[in-house]
Regions:
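A conserved hydrophobic secondary-structure block that centers on an alpha-helix together
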Residues: 122-211
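Low-complexity, Ser/Thr/Pro/Gly-enriched N-terminal "stalk/linker" regions
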Residues: 1-74, 92-123, 158
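Structural helix-adjacent loops and short alpha-helical linkers that scaffold large soluble proteins
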Residues: 7, 11-14, 18-21, 86-99, ...
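Glycine- and aromatic-rich loop/turn segments at beta-sheet edges
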Residues: 43-67, 108-130, 160, 171-194, ...
């Protein structure tokens, strides 16, 4: 079995990082408040009813309504989010909420291990009809398993681990009764708009095996590593066209997790090759998904959630591009690739920075903390956020869980060297050496930052910054040496209390084309994607950064996309004829 090495580049745990940036922190706090105020009886209504229990609570609506076959998916995300907030920040209120959910789940669990908000008969239907008549039952079971596993990991709740193991073994026994081809049909999600999607169940089962060392759980996890995708990826065959994006992104995460567990090179190659293929399908916000190349007219695949051909063009600006769930899963993939493909780590770090600002942070409302489903970027777009109790889209759930870890992937470590990848005001608490690194930054309002060291005694540190992001470093109160190494600016020195580095950031406005389109392009300021919110931009005209953080021209105003809330906006500009893209509201029908 392969063991994680501290010599591999990895993100510092979220528990060691505290957000200070007002935008990141505010949105995280909004989600935390939403979870804390949510009526637990409403959350667990469908679990109780499915177990034959009475409930006087008002049932949830949207994708969690009692008649929706996906009911229970948000509950899994809710539990995972509560557990992560508790583990990462010591939040006692949300720990109590997570533990209370586990108690209710224990009461709802069947003796055979089955635990869900929907009846077992949905799995019978899936086994009988294979890809019709149900809506993604293993997708929902993944969310429930993940919530329980997170509660075990972050809250040290052994009961949650036992419930997860029992549910995993229940699933294992079901598959043991099926033939090879029956399993292949059930888990082959190659149609557009697939109803047999199974999410990241393989990924979470690898985590469950790491916790329990139950070999049947490991065998089950491997079952979800499907060769129609991973075999082709390992061999370098681009078969992504027409696949449902967020069905298959978690399969790549699972493959890379399998490599982490077993060391099987095939699954590392699958992840690395997948990334080379997804790059040509990735928008300037770092995220993917739009219409399928061969879509069904009138279906979701005509606008959203799929991958098209290995290029982007103006037809991809449907209003349903860039599903938020895809952003969260892409972030997980990039974390693994940083460890297991160090040759391309600069590219992965730059991608992570762009993704975090422009698709992860951008997913959340600055007023409610709730998420967009899709993130439209064409002409005259509008953001549409989930309502607190009426939608419960997949991205509502993945959003609350992602908010609990917004502080991840700012700071990294490799062989004792500390890498700062984003200039988001935050504190990194180090155990060895004992010190706190305090980053103060107002980027993108101001292209500078200050990194201060707090310590009781002088410490030796090796700090690295991407040269593409940092123009100059000046040390104050510390004796340092600066060198350039493989695209990084490396500062090595001894730091005492109050010593600090003054950072001058690389931040110029540049054009980013849409694929090979010559007339369709967007503007980025450093890693930050800009949206036109007023007027008309004339290509190549100079823009000035004002005191409010907006960029103004002769007759136009641009704003960082993640700061747009209710305004009509355009990300991808057209210097030729007008685009056909409109706002994404129809993608939610």
């Amino acid at each position: 079995m392969k063991k994680h090495s501290e010599r591999e580049m990895h993100s510092f745990p979220a528990s060691g990082v505290i957000l200070k940036d007002p935008v990141f922190r505010h949105r995280q706090e909004l989600v935390r408040k939403y979870l804390a105020e949510f009526d637990l009886e409403r959350v667990m209504y469908s679990f109780r009813k499915n177990a034959g229990m009475e409930s006087d609570a008002e049932p949830l609506e949207g994708w969690e309504n009692p008649g929706c076959e996906l009911r229970g998916h948000f509950v899994g995300h809710f539990l995972a989010a509560c557990a992560k907030f508790a583990g990462n920040s010591g939040d006692r209120e949300l720990k109590q909420k997570a533990d209370a959910i586990v108690e209710i789940m224990e009461a709802c669990a069947d003796e055979n291990g089955y635990l869900s908000a929907f009846e077992e008969e949905q799995l019978d239907t899936l086994e009988e009809k294979e890809d019709t008549g149900v809506w993604a039952p293993y997708y929902t079971l993944h969310k429930i398993l993940n919530g329980l596993v997170c509660c075990g990991k972050y809250c040290e709740n052994e009961k949650a681990v036992r419930l997860a193991e029992n549910l995993g073994l229940y699933i294992y026994r079901r598959f043991q009764k099926l033939s090879y081809w029956k399993i292949d049909n059930i888990l082959r999600c190659t149609r557009v708009n697939p109803v047999n999607e199974f999410g990241g169940i393989g990924d979470v089962l690898y985590t469950l095996w790491e916790m329990t060392k139950n070999e049947e759980i490991l065998e089950l996890a491997k079952l979800f590593d499907r060769d129609y995708l991973l075999g082709n990826m390992a061999e370098g065959n681009d078969v992504l066209s027409d696949l449902h994006a967020n069905t298959h992104l978690p399969m790549i995460t699972g493959a890379l997790h399998r490599y982490a567990v077993t060391g099987e090179e095939t699954y590392r190659k699958a992840g690395v090759n997948f990334y080379r293929m997804i790059r040509s399908r990735t928008f300037a916000n770092g995220n993917s998904s739009s219409r399928a190349e061969h879509f069904l007219r009138g279906g979701v695949s005509e606008q959203a959630e799929h991958w098209g051909a290995n290029r982007l063009d103006r037809t991809c600006l449907t209003g349903g591009e860039s599903e938020s769930c895809c952003a969260h899963n892409t972030e997980k993939i990039l974390e693994y690739l940083l460890r297991y493909d160090p040759e391309h780590r600069l590219q992965y770090l730059e991608h992570l920075e762009s993704l975090k600002y422009n698709a992860v942070l951008n997913a959340f409302s600055g007023k409610t903390g709730l998420s967009q489903y899709h993130q439209p970027m064409g002409a005259d777009s509008r953001k549409k956020f989930s309502s607190p109790y009426g939608d419960f889209w997949c991205c509502t759930g993945s959003g609350v869980e992602a908010a609990a870890e917004l502080q991840k992937n700012i700071w990294f470590e490799e062989k004792g060297r500390i890498f700062l990848n984003m200039f988001v005001s935050s504190e990194l608490h180090l155990e060895e050496p004992k010190a706190t690194l305090c980053l103060q930054s107002e980027f993108p309002k101001k292209p500078g930052a200050c990194l201060q060291v707090e310590t009781d005694q002088a410490v030796s540190l090796e700090l690295a910054f991407r040269q593409s992001g940092v123009k100059n470093v000046q040390a104050h109160g510390a004796v340092c040496e600066t060198s350039c190494e493989d695209g990084f600016l490396v500062v090595t020195g001894t730091f005492g209390e109050g010593s600090f580095l003054e950072l001058e950031l690389q931040a110029e406005i540049r054009e980013v084309p849409l694929g090979k389109e010559k007339e369709i392009y967007c503007l980025k300021y450093g890693p930050v994607l800009l949206a036109e919110i007023a007027g008309t931009y004339v290509r190549k005209e100079p823009l000035c950064l004002n005191s409010e953080g907006d960029f103004t021209g002769r007759d136009c105003v641009f704003r960082p996309l993640y700061l747009v809330e209710e305004e009509t906006y355009t990300v991808y500009l057209n210097s030729g004829e007008s685009t056909e893209a409109k706002d994404g509201s129809s993608a939610y029908a």
